[in-house]
Curated annotation (Swiss-Prot):
Cellular component per GO, a single term: protein-containing complex
Swiss-Prot/TrEMBL domain comment: The CS domain mediates interaction with HSP90.
UniProt-recorded name of the protein: Protein SGT1 homolog
Encoding gene (name): Sugt1
Oligomeric form and interacting partners: Probably associates with SCF (SKP1-CUL1-F-box protein) complex through interaction with SKP1. Interacts with S100A6. Interacts with HSP90.
Amino acid sequence: MAAAAAGPASSQRFFQSFPDALIDGDPQAALEELTKALEQNPDDAQYYCQRAYCHILLGKYCDGIADVKKSLELNPNNSTALLRKGICEYYEKDYASALETFAEGQKLDGTDTNFDIWIKRCQEIQNGSEPEVSASQRTQSKIKYDWYQTESHVIITLMIKNVQKNDVRVDFSEKELSAVVKIPSGEDCSLKLRLLHPIIPEQSTFKVLSTKIEIKMKKPEAVRWEKLEGQGDVPAPKQFTADVKNMYPSSSHYTRNWDKLVGEIKEEEKNEKLEGDAALNKLFQQIYSDGSDEVKRAMNKSFMESGGTVLSTNWSDVGKRKVEINPPDDMEWKQY
C-alpha cells in the first residue's frame, strides 16, 4: 500500500483507509481490482489485507485466511489483518484459533473494541453458551421497524443503518416474513412476523439503503390491512382506499405521516456536518454509490494502480492506460 512520507497525517490515513469504502460498495469488483494490483505488486501487505476483507464480505472465509496470512508474513504488526484473520477463523468454526488471533491483535491495538466483542463471542461458544440462541439476547436483538401500505404493497422499513447487502437475509412465505441482519458490531438482529393477510412471496423484494432496509411485500389483491400481524380469526378485508395524507399505521401503534418522516431523515442526512477524513469518505462513497458501472470501474482502477494517489471517475481515460503514481506536491510516495 502507498503512504506519504511527509505532509499531513490525515492524508496518510486517507490513503490507507479509503479502499474499504470501495470494497463495501462492490466487494466483487474490488476483489478483481485488488487481484490485478497484486499481480503488479505481489509483496504489498495492505493489498492482501484489503482483499481478505473482500472475501469476508463475499463469505469466502478460507480464501480470506490465506490472504491475511500472506499479509501478516509481510507485515506482522498489522492489527487489522489479525482482526480479519480471526473473523474468518470464527466463521470457519475454528474458535480456538480465532480466540488466539483476536488476543494477539488486542495486544497490538488495545483501543479497538472489536477485539473485545469477538473475544467474548469466542469465549461464550467455548463455554457452551451460544450467544445467538440465548433467550435474553433474542429479546434484546429484535429489529425496530415501521410499516405502511399502498394499494399493491405492504412496505416494512427496518430502522438499521450502514449494513451491507451480504449481511441481510429476508425470507418470504405466504403468511410469514422473517429477516436476519448482521449489524457492524457482529451481532445478529432478527424479525419474524405472522402476517394478517397472505402475500405473493415471488413478487416480494427488499432493498438495502444507507439509512434503512426497505421490504416490499406484494398483495394478491387490493385490500386494506387493518394491522400487520394476525392469528386465528382474520377480520373481513376491506377494499383499499388511498389515503390522501399518506397517514399509515406503524408497529408503534399510532398513526404516522411517513412522507414527513422520510423527508426529515433525508434533511438530517443532507445537513449532517462532517470534517476531515469523514467528510472525504462520505463524499467519495456518495460518488461511488450514485455512479454508473463505468464510474465505479474507473475509481477502482485508478485508486489501485496509482497506489492511492489518484482517484478518477473517467473510464474513457483511465480504462485505456495504466494510472501512474502521482502524490500531492508536498508528499513523497514510498512502497512499504
